Amino acid sequence: MNIAGVVILYHPDIQLLSENIITYVQGLKKLYVYDNSETKTPGIEEALSKLHPFIQYHYFNANEGIAKRLNRAVEEASKNHYDYLLTMDQDSSFKVGDFEKYTSQIQAAAYTNVAQFGVNCQPNFTIPKEQPEEALTLITSGSILNVSLIERVGVFNEDLFIDFVDAEFSYRVVQNGHINLMFSNIILNHALGKLIEGRSLANFKKTLRITHSPIRVYYIIRNGLYLLFKAKGLNAIMKKDVLRCIKILKNDLIYNPELVSVYKNLFSGIFAFLSNKKGEK
């Protein structure tokens, strides 16, 4: 399979990053490693060079968001004539043999109208099935882009900076008559947020809750409101999906240990939406 990959970093743990990259790098012809950290992690270039000779590390001395790095990777993949591009987060990995299984399934079916392939990042909620299914959205990590169709879909929206970048792109895939295809039998090891224990206000039982850093609250509410009220072409199903994602913040508003900062970022994000502020906070 003529495929490159990109993994986007932000203050990575070198050991964990290396362990994750090993699970998919052998199936790639090139891996672009784009570092969004404000300060460079000592020893990272040396560590990456030992993993695979086809790894290219780039440090930008600034965090300019995930969308800009994804667009750079798509541009590089197109310029170097790769057919597909794997997009990964630094904390994501595949089970042994799963990445090879993933790419083999894509090759075997010779899909022509699929702009984006994805995997199952929530096996507790999405039951694995042998046959792939169309999806409204796919997360960035673990997705494989059909480079030839990106021009029709359009590039990733750099105004969003971080959150909803993958969802907004997925919506445009559908709007342009293409398909997001999920292989739910391929499980991605991926953390969607920080898990903390919280007591239910309904039955007082303690359960694990997904929370986010306060700055993520800012981007989730700002970008979510943008998609709901200002983005063009979103149908009712897409807007319902955006609302579902925004509602995830309820755990942060109740259980996040940094409540003061969470609420500051919430109101700051709402104000940013009202004042049409885009990009980085």
Cite the ranges covered by each PLM segment:
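A short, conserved alpha-helix in the catalytic core of glycosyltransferases
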Residues: 149, 159-192
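Short beta-strand-to-loop acidic/aromatic patch adjacent to the donor-nucleotide binding site
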Residues: 82-91
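A conserved acidic beta->alpha catalytic loop
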Residues: 34-45, 92
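Short beta-strand/loop segment that forms part of the nucleotide-sugar
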Residues: 29-39, 58-60
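Non-catalytic, C-terminal membrane-associated alpha-helical segments of glycosyltransferases
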Residues: 228-281
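Short, well-formed alpha-helical segments that are part of the catalytic scaffolds
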Residues: 7-27
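Glycine-rich, basic loop-to-helix element that forms the pyrophosphate-binding segment
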Residues: 60-77
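Conserved donor NDP-sugar-binding/catalytic core segment of glycosyltransferases
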Residues: 95-129
